[in-house]
Amino acid sequence: VGFSAGGHLAAMASTIGSFKPAFSVLFYPVITAVQGKRHQGSFINLLSEQRTPEQDAAYSLESRVTADTPPAILLLSDDDKTVPPVNSTLYYNALKAHGIEASMHIYPSGGHGWGIRDSFRYKAQWQDAVLDWLRRINE
């Protein structure tokens, strides 16, 4: 489970290395370092401002998905101004292209960082979506 930059870490665990989790639950995750689609601050903190295009490519996790990547559910808001929603769609599309179980839930509002906030308008819906998805992948 990961939120925002923590979503990048959780997705890294799913795409890099030989020991992988059984599944990922990713909330508005940072996925890509591609110019114009990335959350700049996350990659400055991770790799510095002097990073190379090769480093950006290596940490753009949509390109690291393989048939061995575990299933994932992605939850985000369409109006997120911090982490562009395209981050989630890139990862979702990569999972689907490899035949991996994936589900994506885009809420019309909420911005960024709503996590488990009680005031998030769609809290009950995301909780139900995650529970239903977990049941489905464990059938």
Over which residues does each language-model region extend?
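Conserved alpha/beta-hydrolase "acid-adjacent" motif
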Residues: 81-90
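Primarily recognizes the serine-hydrolase "nucleophile elbow" in alpha/beta-hydrolase
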Residues: 1-42, 56
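Histidine-centered active-site/metal-ligand motif
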Residues: 8, 76, 112
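Short beta-strand/loop motif that positions the catalytic acidic residue
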Residues: 68, 73-76, 80
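C-terminal catalytic histidine-bearing segment of alpha/beta-hydrolase fold enzymes
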Residues: 89-139
